[in-house]
Amino acid sequence: MGEIRLFPGLLSPPAGLEFFLDLPSEEGAHLIAFAEGALAALKVAFQEGARSLVLLSPILRRDALLSAKLAALRLGLEARGTGGFAQVGRALFFGPKAVGSEEIFAAWKEGLSEEGVRAWLALMEGLSDERRWLRGTEARILVVQGAWDAFTPPFYGKEVADFAKGEALRFTLEEAGHLVPWEAREEVVDLVADFLSGEAFRPLPGGLAL
C-alpha cells in the first residue's frame, strides 16, 4: 500500500479531495492535485521521487487567454466581492450538467472566502510557464479534464501530457467542466483507482501498455 497525498488548490469545493485517500495503490508516494495545486505536487515529486502524479484540470502556465479570464474574475471580485467572482466563475468553471444546478453552485460558492480568492488570483496572475517541472520527475502521470472546461480547455492538459518525461495518460470526460473531480466523481475515481494500482500500465504483448 502506497502513500496518497493531496494538493487541492485554493478554489476546491469544501468537500475537498479526501475521497481519494482510501484508494488502494502501489508502494511509493502518489500525489493527486487539482488545478494550480499541480505545481506544488510537481515540486514534491521532483524532491521526493514520487511514483505517480494525478493532475486534475492542471494549470502550469498563464497565457493571454487565461489572463483575460483572470481579469474578468478580478473585475467581478472588485465590483461585487466573492459573489461577483462566483458569478463570473460559474460560466468558466462548471460543465453543462452542473452550471444550472443551484445546489452545486451554492456549495462551491459557500467555500469561497475573499482572502482565499485574492490569494488565488495573485498566484494565478504571477504564474509563468512552469511546465519545466514536468521534466524533473519520471513519475507516471495521469491527466484528467472536463471536455467542457471553459477555464482551462483540454489543450492545456494535452500540453502537460506532451511535456511529461515519464509515461503519461490523458482523459477528457464529457459533460464536465473545470471542477471535473466533483462534477464527474465516479468516473474520475474509477480512472484514478486503476492508475494508482498500476492497472493503467499493464504490459501487453509487443511491449505496449494500456
Regions found by a protein language model. Name each.
Residues 10, 147-149, 175-177:
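Acidic beta-to-alpha connecting loop that harbors the catalytic carboxylate
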Residues 64-66, 82-135:
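Conserved alpha/beta-hydrolase catalytic His-Asp/Glu region
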